[in-house]
Design a protein with these regions (language model features):
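Sec-dependent N-terminal signal peptides
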Residues: 3-12
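Glycine/small-residue-rich loop that forms an oxyanion/phosphate-binding "nest" at active or ligand-binding sites
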Residues: 89
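Intrinsically disordered, low-complexity segments enriched in small/polar residues
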Residues: 1-4, 143
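Exported/periplasmic ABC-transporter solute-binding proteins
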Residues: 15-72, 76-80, 84, 93-101, ...
Length: 277
């Protein structure tokens, strides 16, 4: 009888811990922010545990479909196939838009280019331009540092520019790898979250390009807070969290923390932008 009572208590404790164990998976754009939010949430709620991992928006959504995450972070909306799969599996979700991000295009700090227009950027990324000669006059190869197909940022840029990336584009695992590549490649171009640049210091040997929507127009930087607030930067986007309804009660206090003063301060302090109310 004592053994049965002990077993019941252990199981009850295990259930209690499971109810306060939150898994967050997905977007590499959001992963540093999610870690910071989780760490600060834990300081106030030490009865909770929050495990955060990246891997890309596609991985987060796949984990959602497989029942392996409570929150799927994504830098893009769900696509038609994913919506159909959720419906087929009987998974109902709630969508939270908790911050906004801008995608920054970067080159080596010594590269002789400060701004680029969308037409030229398209020709660089889709492989139409093989060298920088039409852009800077330098007859050196263009080396593209990008992401895998399951990356929300990869999908976002493809849709915004209506392109297929060059087959020669390097597929990197995340922001850190792209920045590292550009630091050592004087003819490289890559794209990363502006929040990552701001959060990891702008003193690195890289340069953030201004984006011109039309040739000759004023270039806008993704680091320009006022421009982002006015929605003047072409590559800015909302950041999503997809949450199965079965996990909502468990994660609601974490979501409330994100939306509260402390969470909002972390969002802006990490180089991301608040959603206008």
């Amino acid at each position: 009888m004592k053994y049965l009572m002990y077993l019941f208590i252990v199981l009850l404790a295990s259930c209690s811990n499971a109810d306060k164990s939150i898994k967050v998976k997905g977007s590499d754009t959001e992963v540093n922010l999610a870690v910071s939010l989780a760490e600060n949430f834990y300081k106030l709620h030490q009865d909770f545990s929050v495990a955060v991992s990246g891997g890309g928006s596609g991985l987060g959504i796949a984990s959602l479909l497989n029942g392996q995450t409570d929150i799927a972070n994504s830098s893009r909306p769900l696509n038609t196939e994913e919506v159909s799969l959720l419906k087929a599996k009987g998974i109902s979700i709630r969508t939270v838009v908790f911050a906004e991000d801008a995608t920054a295009f970067i080159v080596h700090k010594d590269f002789p280019l400060d701004a680029i227009d969308l037409v030229t950027l398209t020709k660089v990324l889709n492989g139409q331009y093989k060298t920088w000669k039409p852009v800077t006059g330098q007859d050196i190869p263009i080396n593209i540092y990008g992401r895998q197909n399951n990356s929300g940022t990869h999908s976002f840029i493809s849709k915004k520019l209506k392109i297929q990336f060059s087959r020669d584009a390097k597929e990197m695992n995340g922001n850190a790898q792209i920045v590292e590549g550009i630091k050592h490649d004087r003819s490289g171009i890559g794209y990363v979250g502006a929040g990552y640049i701001l959060n990891n210091g702008t003193e690195q040997p890289i340069k953030v390009l201004k984006i011109m929507e039309k040739p000759g127009s004023s270039g806008i930087s993704p680091l320009d807070v006022k421009a982002i607030a006015a929605h003047r930067y072409y590559f800015q986007r909302p950041l999503y969290q997809f949450i199965p309804l079965t996990s909502w009660n468990k994660v609601s206090s974490f979501i409330d923390f994100e939306k509260g003063p402390a969470g909002q301060k972390i969002i802006t302090g990490s180089g991301y932008y608040l959603i206008p109310k």
